[in-house]
Amino acid sequence: MADPIRVSAPISGTDRHLTLETGRFAPQSQGAVVATIGDTRVLTTANAARDVRPGVDFFPLTVDVEERSYAAGKIPGSFFRREGRPTEDAILTCRLTDRPLRPAFAEGFRNETQIVTTVLGVDMENPHDVLSINAASAALMISGIPFEGPLGSVRIAYSTDGEWLPHPTYAESDASTFELVVAGRELDNGDVAVMMVEAGGTERSFYFYEDGAPKVDESVLAGGLEACKIWIKESIALQRQLVASVIATSGPIEPLEYTPVLDYTPEVFAAVESAVAAELAEAVTIARKADRNAATDAAAAKAVAALCTDGAEFAGQEKAVKEAVRSLTKKLVRKRIVEEGVRIDGRGVRDLRPVSAEVGVLPTAHGSGLFQRGETQVMNVCTLAMPRMNQMLDTLSPVNEKRYLHHYNMPPWANGETGRVGSPKRREIGHGALAARAVLPVVPSQEDFAYTLRLVSEVMSSNGSTSMGSVCSSSLSLMDAGVPIRGAVSGIAMGLVKEGDNYVTLTDILGAEDAFGDMDFKVAGTADAITALQLDTKIDGIPADVLTAALQQAREARLQILEVMNAAIGAPRDEVAETAPKIVTLTIPIDKVGEVIGPKGKIINTIQAETGADISVDDDGAVGIVTIGAVEAWRMEEAKAAILAIVDPPKAEIGKTYNGRVVNITKFGAFVSILPGRDGLLHISKLGGGKRINAVEDVLTLGDEIEVVVEEIDDRGKVSLRPAGDPPSGGSGSDGERESRPPRRESRSEGAGASGDVESVSFDDSFDAELAGELGDLGPGSERRGGGGDGRRRHR
């Protein structure tokens, strides 16, 4: 085995190092790098096919992240005990890795390329997602694949003291108000061009704001985008050091030979421009998406008919002609924006489309909101549930459950098309995660609002930024559901067109402007704080001043949208919907948890059956936490009263008569419930009206109601009972039948007392046996009776 090549450098502002290593693992891979921070490490490989697959008219890049449970010292919890489909975290890391890398490959490179990150170890302190980006860039740099890198990436967190922390641990992230993941490349002038941004507020950010932490607004965010450049440069420098070490050890890196693929030749483009430029110039002024697409398709059909028929100059090149039509359409759209400041639908560069908002669109839902901006329409539905509906996670991070769920669905009919309907694709998972990240900071914690929340965004119509439409409709449905969020959240998608040194920022982009532009820039937030940001660019980065101006332009649009949303619903409803469960949370002494649950859940199950409420019991090591929920409030209140009666049972009074119910039968008597949480012992000697009886079951059965009088309460609170009035005389049989029944025989275990002796059990012994659990689980209908401490056991 060859000696590995390893380079390492300290991360400024921390006590940790970033390490890159190659030559130890995956020797047959074209590029393979292990990246490490702390004890978290990933192996990323990069490989490309030698030839272009026939018929491929796009760059076939795939990025996969393989999370191995052994990295965290776990065995997968699935039935087969091995990893299956990627987790949501893995899919999001795939997208995070893909987005900055894709525009950095050489133009015309169409060879199938695959990047695979395998998580080898996690220390539960350092996340592995940013390592994947840096390792992928390094692997591509030593692979020979035509990649215009290196790219560096960093996560920074904004602390409550107003400082940006590089590569924060999980604990540091939880204690911060905002996180930024930024990837970029270093320019010739030493500046860093930002290629990708993924950012959002933390779950407790608004709690920190209430305690005085500085809010993250546009100026703070712009400062963060500038601050991150030092750590991006450090990563890039380390990758260059690795490349230099590889060359010094193994010689020059052999580049992958490939033939650039051109979608069309300049001659084809010129012919298309001559044939249909006028038709396309007219088509790109049509505001309605379907009509515009129809006009563009008609122009493409005309070009194909004119240029590709038998004997024509470009016969057999239909695909090239169609690509040239698309390229000409893009050119015309961009030219009109830059030169005239007019967009496809006639708007100016800062104009919003018509915006509308509604709530309560689904009467049976707990909360619902409908948001529309132009031809983009999204309905969001909020469902509230008990905390036990939190999603359990099997991840490689310290997070093991999720209580705020956002599911995004975009069926093909939202674009007037046909297609596959079913499980979500990576895009849908990514859009749902972005919308969740934008809204989660304003959602109250589970301690303040005990519900599990599931939000579902249904895209009804798509023409630009359905993810930000999901943010707006989520905010509407949460307020309609009565969730006390800390402020309405709106979102907007911005675009950019760059021609030479001229940058034009677009507000509220259409789908076509997204496709033909140079940047997709999404911003979400409340009136005074940003909660999420996502940026992707197709060019060599965006200057800092352009980004700062775009943030301010986005703020103007967000505030306009908030006005429309506030007109629909200005504040969360005072109460949750009638159809939603009503939830109350109680804190009880931890030593009472067992009493509330009962043996094998007997007590809590009985309360649930009698009240119809849903009850869950947990503890945090110091106190017990009881959560009670029911759609009807009275059911919740009844269950609450029953729990409180167990925790602090009412006191019985000596000499008072109670109507009780037999809840347990032992060989020495019957336990009778006389008050919620309060039982007393009716000794066998008090039964039978002065006559000796051989078994309690001769006169009482479980569930019988009986009037009893409190005879004695000892200093430990144990209650002794006697029957009120005439003692019970037995079951359904006549007195004669009972008297004619032969006496019970006593069987004894080896070493027991003489046969026929009746065991004498004291009042204290009876209670102690019951409390110690010696009597077993005596539910309704049970025949089992616990034996005494001397080994004797009665048999019928």
What are these regions (language model features)?
Residues 610-611, 616-624, 630-668, 674-678, ...:
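Intrinsically disordered, low-complexity mixed-charge segments
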